[in-house]
């Protein structure tokens, strides 16, 4: 699986060099798999990873990898390449995204921000800034429903309504999607693929989303630096004050 221009920076640990890398989207066109989504399994699968602390790629599970690869998704990059992908989920604004964008700009780093309909409607200026500064804006659906729980037409509405709204406000065409809550099924992967999207999961995350667990900057840094690996797709939440504080250091 060739890397695409999503999410990019290199974080310096061990032998990983501290450089920035941008990979253009035209290295690999998004491939659409022709299939009847209604005939596919709708068993809900929650994305999960088995961490290690030796900076090697984690175990994502055979089912996860099989389905993500089959529908041309992304979970990790090439383990031989010394870079990582940086992604943020943007369900709502807690006041830290501006600082995150400032840090990325100061370090000449590009990232991917997966936004919801609520985020677009309430933070249109920040979304425009993301695009203007060269970041990728991805689809996290209008209402953040678990997609296996809704029917085909509702999935299409959740995805395409946000896509249309982003285009009308910014002229930007979204190509990447992250399933809300990390929950998916073979049916939902097929549907979003048929809508022209590449699904992006992750290979490193921690409980940064919990508002009650902020004020743990050393914990956050350790969770990232102890588990990072070549080709890593990092999931962070911009609602975390800790992430805004530690981003410049990690």
Q: Where in the sequence are the language-model features?
A:
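C-terminal domain-boundary segment and adjacent tail
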Residues: 72-79, 107-108, 121, 242-250
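Short alpha-helical segments used as structural interaction elements across diverse proteins
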Residues: 1-2, 175
């Amino acid at each position: 699986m060739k890397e695409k221009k999503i999410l990019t920076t290199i974080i310096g640990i061990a032998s990983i060099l501290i450089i920035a890398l941008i990979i253009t989207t035209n290295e690999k066109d998004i491939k659409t798999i022709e299939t009847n989504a209604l005939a596919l399994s709708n068993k809900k699968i929650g994305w999960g990873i088995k961490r290690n602390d030796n900076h090697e790629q984690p175990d994502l599970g055979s089912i996860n990898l099989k389905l993500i690869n089959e529908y041309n998704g992304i979970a990790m990059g090439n383990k031989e390449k010394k870079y990582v992908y940086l992604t943020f989920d943007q369900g709502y604004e807690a006041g830290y995204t501006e600082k995150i964008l400032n840090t990325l700009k100061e370090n000449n780093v590009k990232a991917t921000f997966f936004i919801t309909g609520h985020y677009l409607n309430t933070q249109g200026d920040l979304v425009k800034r993301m695009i203007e500064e060269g970041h990728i804006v991805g689809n996290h659906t209008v209402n953040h429903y678990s997609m296996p729980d809704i029917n085909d037409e509702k999935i299409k509405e959740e995805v395409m309504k946000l896509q249309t709204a982003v285009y009308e406000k910014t002229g930007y065409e979204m190509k990447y999607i992250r399933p809300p809550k990390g929950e998916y099924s073979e049916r939902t992967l097929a549907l979003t693929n048929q809508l022209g999207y590449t699904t992006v999961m992750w290979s490193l995350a921690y409980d940064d989303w919990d508002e009650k667990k902020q004020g743990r900057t050393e914990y956050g840094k350790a969770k990232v630096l102890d588990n990072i690996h070549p080709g890593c797709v990092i999931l962070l939440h911009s609602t975390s004050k800790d992430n805004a504080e530690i981003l410049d250091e990690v």
